Amino acid sequence: MPSPPSPESPATALIALDWGTSSLRAYRLDPAGRTLEQRHSPHGITQLPVAGAEGFVQALQLLAGDWLAAWPRAPLLACGMVGSAQGWREAPYVAVPSDFAGLAGRLVTVPVGSGRTLLIVPGLIEHREGLPNVMRGEETQIAGALALQAVDDLGLIGLPGTHSKWARVADGRVVAFDTYMTGEVYAA
């Protein structure tokens, strides 16, 4: 476990987790949303220290237990595969078009011990021609880009990764998105 935070550490307003299939990333954010510290571990949802819910608790404690102790009132927010059917607790997909108030209204709460809860952000789903297209984690990145006004009210956001996404946004909502195998092709 990392060394405990010093008493001079800046205030933590949020502990954010990007919990994927093969890794877990944690971010300690200040009240303005700036990253104060970040950490990474190999404990994705398929690489937990032990199986089941206890494995998720252990992975969280191993990576950020000192943060949880130092900032007991800081909310915990997670996105990614942690909210899948194979994750800690399923956060059912929200259909597009969707704004981020719609996502916030569908957060799933998971107790993590010591009276704390973790909020899991649901992913997005689009049904086109009868086939589902999904994202988990990227919706949170899109919300950040929109909050920073990095994208106009009508735009296209590219999200590189194993399953790269191109999301169309309009008026603060994700209206459609496409998924590409680009990352898988390069990794092959």
Residue ranges and their predicted role:
Residues L14-D18, P75-L77, G155-L159:
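Short glycine-aspartate micro-motif
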Residues L14-G55:
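Short glycine-rich, Thr/Ser-proximal phosphate-binding strand/loop in the N-terminal lobe
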Residues G20-R25, M81-A85, L159-K165:
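Gly/Ser/Thr-rich loops at beta-strand to alpha-helix junctions
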Residues T46-L48, I125-A188:
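Glycine-rich phosphate-binding loop plus the immediately following alpha-helix
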